C-alpha cells in the first residue's frame, strides 16, 4: 500500500480575515496567505470577485472544517451603482448592453428600496460561478452562450443609501444572506428605475461573525513576515540557516472557535477534554450547561476542541480538532 506523503508546511490553525485588494482573485488570495504563513492547508469562506475589495475570511489548517459556518453567515457590502448602462457582467468589467439617458432622483431610489428588502427573488449574473449542467455559468458566458439561470430566493435584511455623489452614481450598504448577488441587485434596480445600472465599486465589510476590525491588509502581513533563509548562487540554502520566527505573523490569526459564535459553547475540564479527544461523550456540568442542542461546541482552556450535539445533558462529539 502506498504511503501518504508528508504534508508540507506548518500545522497552524485559525482564521486570517484578509482585506483583499481589488484585482486579486479569491483563489490567488488563498494561495498568497497559505504561502505567507507556510500553512499545510488553507481555504476561503465565500468567493469575492476580483473587482471587489474587502473581507475574505481565509481558514488555515483545522479551521477549514468550520468554513461552512462562516459561509452561512450574514454579509455586509458597500457598493456604488452607476446609472445609465447595463453591462454584460453587471459590473465595470463587462461591455455595455443597454443604455439610457435617464437618471433617477434620490427620492425615486429611496422609494424603491422597500421592494428589495426581505425575501426577494433574483437571477444570478450570466458571469457567475453558478453551475449549469455541470459547467460554470461564467465559462459558458465567455464562450458566447446565453444560459438560463434559475431564479433563487435570497434575504435582504437591510438596504440603504449611504451616498449620492452625483446624478450618475448612488452609494449603498446592504446586509444580506448567503447567495445574494450584489451585481444582480444593481441590475434589477436599474431596470425597475427605467435607467439601467451596473456595479462600479464593491467592498465587503463584514462576514458574520467577523467585522471590519478583524481585517488585516497584505501590507500588514508582509511587514511581519519572516524572510526566507538566504541562498547561494546555485539556489541552495546557506547553512546554518536561521530559524524563521513566525510569532508576529501568527499573532494576527484569529482562533478557530471564533467562527462558531452561532453555536452554544461549553468549557470542559482537562479530564473531560481528554475523553472528547478520544471520541467519547461527556456529561456537561454546571448550572448553565444546556441539556439539549442539535449542534454545539466544547472548548478547553479557551480553545475549540470539538463540534457535536447535546442530548440529555451529554455532549457527543462529531468532529474533534487536534489543535484543541
Swiss-Prot record:
Which keywords label this protein? Isomerase, tRNA processing
> Could you tell me the EC number(s) of this protein?
5.4.99.25
The question of whether Metal-binding is a record keyword is answered with no
- List of catalytic residues: 49 (nucleophile)
Coiled-coil portions: none
Region annotation Disordered: where it falls in the sequence: 87-107
Domain of life from the UniProt record: Bacteria
Catalytic reactions of this protein: uridine(55) in tRNA = pseudouridine(55) in tRNA
The biological processes this protein is annotated with in GO are: mRNA pseudouridine synthesis; tRNA pseudouridine synthesis
Give TM regions. Answer: none
Q: Which GO terms describe its molecular function?
A: RNA binding; tRNA pseudouridine(55) synthase activity
Q: In its keyword annotation, does this UniProt entry include 4Fe-4S?
A: no
By its UniProt entry, which InterPro entries does this protein fall under? Answer: PsdUridine_synth_cat_dom_sf, PsdUridine_synth_N, tRNA_psdUridine_synth_TruB, tRNA_sdUridine_synth_fam1_C, TruB_C
Function of this protein?
Responsible for synthesis of pseudouridine from uracil-55 in the psi GC loop of transfer RNAs.
Family per record = Belongs to the pseudouridine synthase TruB family. Type 1 subfamily.
Task: Output this protein's name.
Answer: tRNA pseudouridine synthase B
Upper classification of the source organism reads: Bacteria, Pseudomonadati, Pseudomonadota, Alphaproteobacteria, Hyphomicrobiales
